[in-house]
UniProtKB/Swiss-Prot annotation:
GO cellular component annotations of the record: Golgi apparatus; Golgi lumen; Golgi membrane; trans-Golgi network
Cellular localisation: Golgi apparatus membrane
Entry comment on modification after translation: N-glycosylated.
Membrane topology, from the record: Single-pass type II membrane protein
Ranges facing Cytoplasmic side: 1-8
Catalytic activity as recorded in UniProt: L-tyrosyl-[protein] + 3'-phosphoadenylyl sulfate = O-sulfo-L-tyrosine-[protein] + adenosine 3',5'-bisphosphate + H(+)
Subunit structure: Homodimer. Can also form heterodimers with TPST1.
Sites annotated Transition state stabilizer: 157, 284
Residues given in the record as 3'-phosphoadenylyl sulfate binding sites: 77-81, 182, 190, 194, 237, 284-293, 299
Protein name (Swiss-Prot/TrEMBL): Protein-tyrosine sulfotransferase 2
Species, as recorded: Rattus norvegicus (Rat)
Example of a GO MF term: protein-tyrosine sulfotransferase activity
BP GO terms, sorted: fusion of sperm to egg plasma membrane involved in single fertilization; peptidyl-tyrosine sulfation; prevention of polyspermy
InterPro entries registered for this protein in UniProt: P-loop_NTPase (IPR027417), TPST-like (IPR026634)
Length: 376
């Protein structure tokens, strides 16, 4: 018995010595490589790059840079909230509320690239483009994945993220983008009347806001075209409202997601588990609780100053480029589907449900500001 124990101890000792010898040999080789000026970067293993989350249904979800993320964006007041609410109504998709931080971090990354002096300093410090991109990739994925419940398909809605579509497509090669497009006159009227603060936009001036709208949508549209039609789909707000079923079928086909009738009734899933989460501080919340309706389409007509109407084609040339008539007040957007007409009658009669957790907020909000119906 004593002999067998000795043999076991001897075998264990030999094994430990072998392991230590192998590790020591590896360290010697690494030291030689460093001294010789050849340093191979340590790369994360594929399993380390995955983000693992457990859903309320006890299903494990794994997220990584190769997953098909969805990015929804556009100039604010162009229907981005409506679009993401419709996607949130799908049982396999989760967008959630605006993160607000993702477009700011993307803007910082862009600023570092544009500044030659700053880029030189970063490179000297070893903070190369590869290091920054890996950090951005991990940060963005972490924020998108963890700011809401896990789902098979994750989506992000921060309007200005689509100013960086080309960069995001490089970070997440299987991602797809939905660029919300809306008549700039309607978007600007909504910004001004609802007092939606946007950096750089002078809400006291239709001319200034239309000029800034034109610049913003021009950048986003160019990015969308550069990414390519197979990865970025322009979605016209007016057509989404007038023909929701047709538009959503096209959108889901583009995203490679199976059809579900729930996307046509997002208002029924607001505040419900696995449904549509809304923020009390987002300006569109009081509109998106209603079914898709026509109230917001032409509400801008008659409110834009005459001199701005006269100069519209010069102030906002992107209107014509996107297919809008800059001289029509309002343009003929098309004829609505019967369900949308019915929804509009319901909204005018107040025949829709306000989620219990938002009732007090809307009573206060409606007493302090004029009501604006319609989905935006």
């Amino acid at each position: 018995m004593r002999l067998s124990v000795r043999k076991v101890l001897l075998a264990v000792g030999c094994a430990l010595a072998l392991v230590l010898a192998v590790q020591l040999g590896q360290q010697v080789l690494e030291c030689r490589a460093v001294l010789g000026g050849v340093r191979s970067p340590r790369r994360m293993q594929p399993e380390q790059e995955e983000l693992v989350m457990l859903g309320a249904d006890h299903v494990e979800y794994r997220y990584g840079k190769t997953m098909p993320l969805i990015f929804v964006g556009g100039v604010p007041r162009s229907g981005t909230t409506l679009m993401r609410a419709m996607l949130d109504a799908h049982p396999e998709v989760r967008c959630g509320e605006e993160t607000r931080i993702i477009p700011r971090v993307l803007a910082m990354r862009q600023a570092w690239t544009k500044s030659g002096r700053e880029k030189l300093r970063l490179d000297e410090a070893g903070v190369t483009d590869e290091v920054l991109d890996a950090a951005m990739q991990a940060f963005i994925l972490e924020v998108i994945a963890k700011h809401g419940e896990p789902a098979r398909v994750l989506c992000n809605k921060d309007p200005f993220t689509l100013k960086s579509s080309v960069y995001l497509a490089r970070l997440f090669p299987n991602s797809k983008f939905l660029l919300m497009v809306r008549d700039g006159r309607a978007s600007v009227h909504s910004m001004i009347t609802r007092k939606v603060t946007i950096a750089g936009f002078d809400l006291s001036s239709y001319r200034d806001c239309l000029t800034k709208w034109n610049k913003a949508i021009e950048v986003m549209y160019a990015q969308c075209m550069e990414v390519g039609r197979d990865k970025c789909l322009p979605v016209y707000y007016e057509q989404l409202v007038l023909h929701p079923r047709r538009s959503l079928k096209r959108i889901l086909d583009f995203l490679g997601i199976a059809w579900s009738d729930t996307v046509l009734h997002h208002e029924d899933l607001i505040g419900k588990p696995g449904g549509v989460s809304l923020s009390k501080i987002e300006r569109s919340t009081d509109q998106v609780i209603k079914p898709v309706n026509l109230e917001a389409l032409s509400k801008w007509t008659g409110h834009i100053p005459r001199d701005v109407v006269r100069d519209m084609a010069q102030i906002a040339p992107m209107l014509a480029r996107l297919g809008y008539d800059p001289y029509a007040n309002p343009p003929n957007y098309g004829n609505p589907d019967p369900i949308v007409i019915n929804n509009t009658h319901r909204v005018l009669k107040g025949d829709y449900k306000t989620p219990a957790n938002l009732k007090g907020y809307f009573q206060v909000n409606q007493n302090s500001t004029s009501p604006h119906l319609g989905s935006s």
